[in-house]
């Protein structure tokens, strides 16, 4: 079933023209509209911009151009990453109107790698819990058992992946916030080495966690997806791309 294919597999399907990015985005959106009301993983929707990005990906491919390893792959991101024009709340009611003016650097790099970002996923208050409830968006449920938690703080990310509502995801981790929900939901998650991935655009306004604790990282449907995500966002990948 295409909903449960890895990001690398989805990118290959698009590259081989077995499915278009627009078709794949529409497919994931249809699954969000069908299943998200029960799971409550995706809490911010940015469909119109995503449709334009998917169309651009298809147009570039028709010219023989590939944008990157995630070319045309629809994905969502944790509600702690800035996505221009959308709210970054971090689950904190005080930030419910905090509209990002520009993308986080990691989001910018994911887009440069070809990803089509169509929404954001739920988190606990200030990303500080092993469940994913906040007063703004409510509780995210585990898609395997709606009476149970998907974990946290990247619970919305893991639940969206496990339910086949997105092709790839992002999270962040200090003491298990990627690894815990990945385990709870049966998907893959990786806490990268500190300093490998850029944290700019992943912090509360005027507040920074200790830089030697917080890292950002990928969640996916395969271990290969984790490598793809890390390389797409890392400084190493940027230097290689520029040379």
Segments predicted by a language model, with ranges:
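Short, well-ordered beta-strand elements within core beta-sheets of diverse protein domains
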Residues: 10-16, 95-99, 214-221
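Conserved hydrophobic/aromatic pocket- or pore-lining residues that grip, position, or stack substrates
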Residues: 28, 50, 72, 78, ...
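Immediate post-signal peptide segment of exported/extracytoplasmic ligand-binding proteins
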Residues: 57-73
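Enzymes and membrane/adaptor proteins characterized by extended Gly/Ser/Thr/Asp/Glu-rich
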Residues: 69-106
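Short glycine/serine-rich loop segments
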Residues: 102-230
């Amino acid at each position: 079933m295409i909903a449960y294919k890895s990001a690398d597999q989805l990118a290959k399907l698009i590259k081989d023209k077995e499915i278009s990015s627009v078709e794949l985005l529409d497919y994931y959106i249809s699954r969000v509209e069908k299943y998200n009301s029960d799971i409550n993983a995706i809490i911010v929707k940015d469909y119109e911009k995503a449709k334009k990005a998917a169309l651009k990906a298809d147009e570039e491919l028709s010219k023989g151009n590939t944008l990157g390893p995630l070319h045309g792959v629809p994905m969502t991101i944790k509600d702690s990453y800035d996505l221009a024009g959308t709210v970054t709340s971090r689950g904190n009611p005080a930030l419910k109107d905090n509209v990002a003016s520009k993308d986080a650097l990691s989001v910018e790099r994911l887009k440069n790698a070809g990803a089509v970002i169509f929404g954001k996923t739920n988190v606990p208050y200030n990303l500080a819990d092993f469940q994913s409830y906040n007063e703004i968006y409510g509780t995210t449920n585990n898609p395997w058992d709606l009476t149970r938690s998907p974990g946290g703080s990247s619970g919305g990310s893991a639940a969206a992946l496990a339910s086949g509502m997105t092709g790839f995801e992002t999270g962040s981790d200090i003491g298990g916030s990627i690894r815990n929900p990945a385990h709870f939901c049966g998907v893959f998650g990786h806490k990268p080495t500190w300093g490998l991935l850029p944290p700019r655009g992943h912090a509360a306004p005027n507040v920074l966690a200790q830089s030697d604790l917080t890292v950002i990282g990928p969640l996916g449907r395969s271990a290969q997806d984790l490598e793809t995500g890390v390389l797409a966002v890392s400084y190493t990948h940027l230097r290689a791309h520029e040379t």
